[in-house]
């Protein structure tokens, strides 16, 4: 086969339909950013990079050029924070806000939103799913990458995910191994996905990096409604069939599964585009150091801090009048927000979720969640 001729034909096919519907996944709790992230103010409502915009607002602004306006932008979120979404995104049409009665992870969210957009715009509609709480640099590169993913998904039956080039052996991200190279879109190579691997140990992650074939799983996807609905019917009928039969009223009875587990690890239509834009999923407090570390300061200080023999600390206070004083501390996170002070070693921030379970089970502290 003449690959160049094949890719040229794909490009001609992809230009036939330009409607694109970005969907923002905004139902998460951001528990590992507690106590700053709480039930009444989850991570997506926060600004963590020093800007005036929340993560949700920044995500919407990034996607508006792709959506060609608010009328094509969608958000799916939980009933607990739906009003907060309305306040943060006042221009979002109410009909484009999908409100989950209970959280059922990303597979149910993707299935429901895809069904709704399919009803309104038909099976040829192109959809992209984007987490609300990620940090992305290089907006022009981001837009070009999504355009390439859309071009690929319009051209052939494909569920396209964006892979982030890893720059260190992270144990906190999932990995995607590239398989056969298809061709290039917008000068970006497209690969068939060989396999997904959930959060590996450090040695395995280092091996992945050395091969040059692996990228981080960004959690961003692009596809045509007809393709994803057909694949969900094949690989996740326990999610899509009840939604098709009963609608969102069945939500509490749906299984709680991620889209990676329910579909991406099973489908033969998964493709990956390695992305070149700066990215961080802001998974826990250590992400603040990756974003804001300055060479002339041994600590990351988002508070008034007086320190003696303190290095590698991340220090945050929501009240500018609070002063945090440290002596002889290395590699810690200190967060002061409202009526809570958190002190934790940087390598144990993943355990914050365990603390939240303790608080939830102890009736005295539910107001701290």
Regions found by a protein language model. Give the residues of each.
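Short beta-strand segments
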Residues: 24-26, 76, 128-131, 161-165, ...
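Conserved N-terminal catalytic core of the sugar/cofactor nucleotidyltransferase
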Residues: 2-24, 32-39, 49-131, 135-141, ...
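Residue-level signal for inorganic ion chemistry
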Residues: 56, 113, 133, 176, ...
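Conserved core of the sugar-phosphate nucleotidyltransferase
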Residues: 139-241, 248-251, 271, 345-346
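A residue-level structural signature of the nucleotidyltransferase/glycosyltransferase Rossmann-like core
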Residues: 74, 127, 194, 213, ...
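Left-handed beta-helix
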Residues: 3-14, 223-369
